[in-house]
Swiss-Prot record:
GO cellular component annotations of the record: plasma membrane
Pfam families with a match to the protein in the record: Glyco_tran_28_C, Glyco_transf_28
Species per Swiss-Prot/TrEMBL record: Nitratidesulfovibrio vulgaris (strain DP4)
Protein name in UniProt: UDP-N-acetylglucosamine--N-acetylmuramyl-(pentapeptide) pyrophosphoryl-undecaprenol N-acetylglucosamine transferase
Entry similarity comment: Belongs to the glycosyltransferase 28 family. MurG subfamily.
Membrane topology designation: Peripheral membrane protein
Pathway the protein takes part in: Cell wall biogenesis; peptidoglycan biosynthesis
Taxon lineage: Bacteria, Pseudomonadati, Thermodesulfobacteriota, Desulfovibrionia, Desulfovibrionales
Length: 365
């Protein structure tokens, strides 16, 4: 491969698998140019820059469920497709891979209009609208979970797993010495954009967590960082580490005994590869409730506990968290179950699939 475009955007759940594949491509093909094509309004430009990738932004926004604003979004999509089409002509990619999200719709469709080979990757247990539509025009659909095998034409699908960054794969491969029984560490993450319901539940739990000697590393999201930081200071929880965004998530996973987080597909895949027990709080307004389906994949295998957001106010969250953190045997069983579901080779499997696709797919000039 000489030139590859990876296209997606919106949330880390789409973006981080693309970055994992970029890592794998650059490790195998150091001379290959990888271009990241994403939306102008999400975190993808910053994340691509941190990963050392060239970035092209498209003026696209979500259309689904936006009412009258969908008209403006449709114009943005048309402009995004036009820009992506122009970029395809200049960059001349060998292949284009989309990871869902509206930027991927523009990028992959433009690739097909240019006659370039293209494929898509679906992270969730319930396929997104973008990938359901694009599956009609691409020859290969990479899947993360067996639950989605029936959602796409079987002759196009490849069950590859959800690509996870190499640093997290390394974290899952390490076997650290057991911590002393009195050391309990809780990692709280609300996804790349944060989660107010999770933030509030943890703040309410701080007195009980402090009494139990629980250390907390809390990713709040940028919008909630100042408020939650002040709450930690007011409660006197000296063991709290509060950040808007965790750059080195592999170190955070390695540090943690238990993770409290949303159930985005990439979070679930990372938990499995890292072998981390979790309490999962699915985002209840996700399209087609896909986060609940993602969560149940780990919960049904004994690797996680499901806490629905609507039940938080009726749940003794401090007792749940302290109880799990105090039960080393259960945490160890959950960790083993999580690791058994992990696909540390997913990025390699996707790149293998791209190489094979290039061998069999004609390219228009």
């Amino acid at each position: 491969m000489r030139r590859v475009i990876l296209t997606t955007g919106g949330t880390g759940g789409h973006i981080f698998p693309a970055l994992a594949v970029a890592e794998e491509i650059r490790a195998r093909y150091p001379e290959c140019s990888v271009l990241f094509m994403g939306g102008l309004y999400g975190p993808e430009a910053d994340l691509a820059a941190r990963a050392g990738l060239d970035f092209v932004g498209l003026p696209v926004r979500g259309v689904l469920g936006r009412g009258v604003r969908a008209i403006g979004a449709a114009f943005g999509m048309a402009a995004g497709i036009a820009r992506a089409y122009a970029v395809m002509g200049r960059f001349d990619p060998d292949i284009v891979l989309g990871f869902g999200g509206y930027a991927a719709f523009a990028g992959v469709l433009a690739a097909r209009l240019r006659g370039r080979p293209a494929a898509i990757h679906e992270q969730n247990s319930v396929p997104g609208v973008t990938n359901r539509v694009l599956s009609r025009v691409v020859p290969r659909v990479f899947l993360s979970l067996p639950d989605t095998l029936g959602a796409f034409p079987p002759q196009k699908t490849c069950l590859a797993g959800n690509p996870v960054r190499a640093s997290i794969v390394a974290c899952g491969a390490e076997r650290s010495d057991p911590r002393p029984d009195h050391v309990r560490r809780l990692l709280v993450m609300g996804g790349s954009l944060g989660a107010r319901a999770i933030n509030d539940a943890v703040v309410s739990s701080l007195p009980a967590l402090a009494e139990a000697g629980v250390e907390v590393w809390h990713q709040t999201g940028a919008a909630d960082w100042e408020r939650i930081r002040k709450a930690y200071a007011e409660t006197g929880h000296g063991e709290g580490r509060v950040e808007a965004f965790i750059d080195d998530v592999a170190s955070a996973y390695a540090w943690a005994d238990l993770v409290l987080c949303r159930a985005g597909a990439t979070s679930v895949a990372e938990l499995a590869v890292a072998g981390k027990p979790a309490v999962l709080v699915p985002y209840p307004f996700a399209t087609h409730d896909h986060q609940t389906h993602n969560a149940r994949w780990l919960v049904s295998r004994g690797a996680a506990v499901l806490l629905e957001q609507k039940d938080i106010s009726m749940t003794d969250v401090p007792a749940l968290l302290v109880g799990l953190l105090s039960d080393r045997a259960r945490l160890n069983r959950m960790a083993v179950s999580a690791r058994a579901q992990g696909r540390p080779d997913a990025a390699a499997a996707v790149v293998d699939g791209l190489v094979e696709l290039l061998k069999t797919t004609p390219r228009a000039r």
